[in-house]
Amino acid sequence: MASENTAGSGSRVAGMVYSLWLLVLGPSVLALEEVLLDTTGETSEIGWLTYPPGGWDEVSVLDDQRRLTRTFEACHVAGLPPGSGQDNWLQTHFVERRGAQRAHIRLHFSVRACSSLGVSGGTCRETFTLYYRQADEPDSPDSISAWHLKRWTKVDTIAADESFPASSSSSSWAVGPHRTDQRVGLQLNVKERSFGPLTQRGFYVAFQDTGACLALVAVKLFSYTCPSVLRAFASFPETQASGAGGASLVAAVGTCVAHAEPEEDGVGGQAGGSPPRLHCNGEGRWMVAVGGCRCQPGHQPARGDKLCQACPEGSYKALPGNVPCSPCPARSHSPDPAAPVCPCLQGFYRASSDPPEAPCTGPPSAPRELWFEVQGSALMLHWRLPQELGGRGDLLFNVVCKECGGHKEPSSGGMCRRCRDEVHFDPRQRGLTESRVLVGGLRAHVPYILEVQAVNGVSELSPDPPQAAAINVSTSHEVPSAVPVMHQVSRAANSITVSWPQPEQTNGNILDYQLRYYDQAEDESHSFTMTSETNTATVTRLSPGHIYGFQVRARTAAGHGPYGGKVYFQTLPQGELSSQLPEKLSLVIGSILGALAFLLLAAITVLAVIFQRKRRGTGYTEQLQQYSSPGLGVKYYIDPSTYDDPCQAIRELAREVDPTYIKIEEVIGAGSFGEVRRGRLQPRGRREQAVAIQALWAGGAESLKMTFLGRAALLGQFQHPNILRLEGVVTRSRPVMVLTELMELGPLDSFLRQREGQFSSLQLVAMQRGVAAAMQYLSSFAFVHRALSARSVLVNSHLVCKVARLGHSPQGSSSLLRWAAPEVITHGKYTTSSDVWSFGILMWEVMSYGERPYWDMSDQEVLNAIEQEFRLPPPPGCPTGLHLLMLDTWQKDRARRPHFDQLVAAFDKMIRKPDTLQAEGSSGDRPSQALLNPVALDFPCLDSPQAWLSAIGLECYQDNFSKFGLSTFSDVAQLSLEDLPGLGITLAGHQKKLLHNIQLLQQHLRQPGSVEV
């Protein structure tokens, strides 16, 4: 069935017509016109058939551009009797369709107005009719004479938009048989029609005149073709337009460009998906894109979506897709283009479980400092971690045991063989995670070589054997038995004297005893040893008020026996006199009476405190918060700034170290007082240990020296596993130095930023728990940190977090405003409660992996936000309960903030129930808003929990509240996170919203004058 497409007046550009086509990405392309027949500009005879003869005349005239062209004219209206009809036919030659499914025809013609021809009686028309006829072959000579009688399909009746009057200069051809070759330029109409679908080899087009005076100046037959195009990394060929018209589509299958592959189902799955498709409509326009292609691994998009270009040298792309190549990870390089993965540099490897974007890593270096303790026929083998871990965290140890016929060096193996099966290892021989192993089943007096290998996830990929350290060992069953018991003889603030009996089985002459001791607050691996030729020893240079663990073993010519059981003794607090066992009875009685008096006084104090609590209604007084302790004794620390001579404070509060015991190594940083270096400290009779050494700048002011030594004296007073330990000071020689334990991993904030996303919520909570425990300990001494933040906490190789920077003065440091409580900002009021606020900011830093609090907001913007009670939102992946704990620490009223012991208890509860630490959302998403704004509900207008639920947009849980009898605000205020699943509230977003509003409800109920419904 033919369809119409009318064009405006005027000429058209021959050959190609600009046409916009709309795809998903909206490109512009050119629709192609494939010409089947065109008489435009013809000057020689065309020779189409006419019926009857003379019904149409072929003449040369001037067109609208005053160019000479061949035309067909029909004008037989003058002189005809009224009512006589005209039936003049004009037929083209046979036109090959050449694959076209639909033909378009563009006609340029001129029609004379009947009114200007002086013809009446209804015999004049200003229209003509267009027909077409399909055929597989041109008409035979026998059928040419009857061509007008064949079965034609009407396309349309063509009417002129404008008919033109017959001018005097052109009237000679317009009526009757008069002809001339000199015409005035014709005024033309332009009409376009289409017909189809075409199914045979070709077709004819015919024009029927039934009484018009017209000139057919140009006839153009053509078909539309969608051009070849590149789109979405696929090429699509030229495609013939549909034969059913503009609304129908022809699908074209695309071919992926070089180094591209089809997306699966058009959305980007694995290779081998369906080829992409475009659809060509009836007007030669591409539309409706389905699917596409994507660049293969090792290739990236180029020139928009036209090409897939090889990744340049030094970059890679592991997965198919239309994303750019990435630079090679650390310690890898791609020497050639189009790399799907970057090969590791020599000596570095990537484990099979490592993703392509992971940096290459190497095997660890050998373990360090092997030593052992003989325990009868067994021994406990110890070692220190390797110096280099290879950039990985999956360090393991293997133990190789060799039995030798004589004492051999570890490097020699000529007379050694693998240990017998009787030798066993506890907990195991391979894959050890701890730096010790118990080796049992050893034969007496047989020399062994124990080799400890350090391995990690890439050790098997290295052609070299694992790095190892070895030690010669031997055991004897004739060594002394264990010392059965140990007694405390006396104690002082800095020393303890102990004694012990002989072993029950000496198995020879006792040569001496080895005493091992360590501070219970520290790791047992930091123990010290001393040798005594008698069964009594005095251990000096201890810390006042600390508990120490002791063990002793005897040595004969056969070797050391096993250590006896551990016993614990405590030094006296600073300032108390020494105590001995044979004390006088009067002293004992006096001590007992004094203790009873003290307990009575303490009981009176407690009763007074309880009475004041009931009267005031606050959780505690500021004085009690700062100065009371669970043991009912007052703890305190000495402020070094009260000393006129800082060296005197150092002598009393810190331990002087002989410089000859110190070995200084490389620089690891710089502080406000001088360079910080790694070093080794090995006092006489003690094991060597790694330390950090800060030396005071030469030529510094005396005030700088006083501050430097004052901080060391302050640090030396606190002994806690989560507080940086002072190892000693050097003040009697130059340069002045302060030695602390070495924290290998540096400040907590930078440590987390370098390892974003590598820890579980449980691990992060454990880090925060350690800091909270340290702050609980400091608060028991009424010590206020004033500068607590993630950068003031250091991390060691065992991921233990320790508080540092004690004595730091925050005055004049605007950078600490982000951690400061409101009362600090407005009144300079530093208390343990302000430390709690700072600790909440530290919690947020930990959960956000070192993100800067309040991001890029200015200090003034931060102050304004805090004053308006805006608070930091939960970091990505932060458990709800943990963020609620942060919000508790950020209470504007400091009396409502939790104590550090409450925070420690909360962390312990989370660690015991790790299922409460499930993250709310994706760890990769950033919060949608900068700060949380507390919802300002009009509580007096809310008369029930149901109304409250509607006000916060959770009315869907009204039935749940009614079912469980939650009829008052007091009931609702007692709900916790653990209660919500039992109420049927399981959506994490709803839980968070409900808990946040419960917190606001609790604040409202605590306000004076609030009425509970």
UniProtKB/Swiss-Prot annotation:
Signal peptide: 1-31
Residues spanning the membrane: 591-611
UniProt topology in membrane: Single-pass type I membrane protein
Keyword line: ATP-binding, Glycoprotein, Membrane, Nucleotide-binding, Receptor, Repeat, Signal, Transmembrane, Transmembrane helix
Post-translational modification: Ligand-binding increases phosphorylation on tyrosine residues. Phosphorylation on tyrosine residues is mediated by transphosphorylation by the catalytically active EPHB1 in a ligand-independent manner. Tyrosine phosphorylation of the receptor may act as a switch on the functional transition from cell adhesion/attraction to de-adhesion/repulsion.
Domain of life: Eukaryota
Subcellular location field: Membrane
GO biological-process terms attached to the record: activated T cell proliferation; axon guidance; ephrin receptor signaling pathway; positive regulation of T cell costimulation; T cell mediated immunity; type IV hypersensitivity
Chief subcellular location: membrane
Domain spans labelled Fibronectin type-III: 363-478, 479-574
Motif (PDZ-binding): 1011-1013
Domain SAM: 940-1004
Binding site for ATP: I668, G669, A670, G671, S672, F673, G674, E675, V676
Example GO molecular function: transmembrane-ephrin receptor activity
Domain notes: The protein kinase domain is predicted to be catalytically inactive. Its extracellular domain is capable of promoting cell adhesion and migration in response to low concentrations of ephrin-B2, but its cytoplasmic domain is essential for cell repulsion and inhibition of migration induced by high concentrations of ephrin-B2.
Protein family according to the UniProt entry: Belongs to the protein kinase superfamily. Tyr protein kinase family. Ephrin receptor subfamily.
Function: Kinase-defective receptor for members of the ephrin-B family. Binds to ephrin-B1 and ephrin-B2. Modulates cell adhesion and migration by exerting both positive and negative effects upon stimulation with ephrin-B2. Inhibits JNK activation, T-cell receptor-induced IL-2 secretion and CD25 expression upon stimulation with ephrin-B2.
Quaternary structure and partners: Interacts with CBL and EPHB1. Interacts with FYN; this interaction takes place in a ligand-independent manner.
This protein's name: Ephrin type-B receptor 6
Organism of origin: Rattus norvegicus (Rat)
Lineage: Eukaryota, Metazoa, Chordata, Craniata, Vertebrata
Gene: Ephb6
